[in-house]
Amino acid sequence: MFSSYKPCEVGVPQGSILGPLIFLIYIYDLSYELDCQCEQYADDTTMSASSQSNEETARVLTNNCEKVSQWMSQNQLKLNPDKTHKMTVGTSHRLKSQDANICVTMDGFTLQESIEKSETILGVTVQSNLKWNTHVSDVRNKLKKRIAGIYKIRHVVPFQTLKTISEGWVNSVLVYCLPLFGGCELSDLKDLQVIQNKVAGMVTSS
């Protein structure tokens, strides 16, 4: 049984098997319109720029934001202002100074600073001061329920099965993007080590 045909004149049909691939083709040329660093994954796009002065950084980002706005208009897409914001990255001392306030505008509105001074990019929480305590806290909270599940079944399933479950449920989360945040403070690393030791103890004593 086949559904009836329906023309799709704008955008990409959602729920289709080829939808993700078609969408990537649809936005493929966006990065070529920009003259700053641009990272894309699915429908998320991150632009970044740096220079010797905040004024120059603001100018570069504002110009590229306008290019994005024009590209979206040409492709009949609409920007969501609530999901579009900026984050200023630097040392804690620099961020506290007045010089850290960079004004970037796009499509007639001023981009607001990220809430909590952090952004989650592909599952990694990046803080504006480039510390990782927030990400480590997120990892710890994510693993709490998983560890509780392993604890309940530790005497029910065989050792090899429990080992496989722990590697899939816990280790995969611990090592995800580890080279990126592996240089965090020692106290944060100890928190992760405690989790790893706890799971290892559950598995070996099963």
Where are these regions (language model features)?
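Basic, alpha-helical interaction scaffolds
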Residues: F109-G182
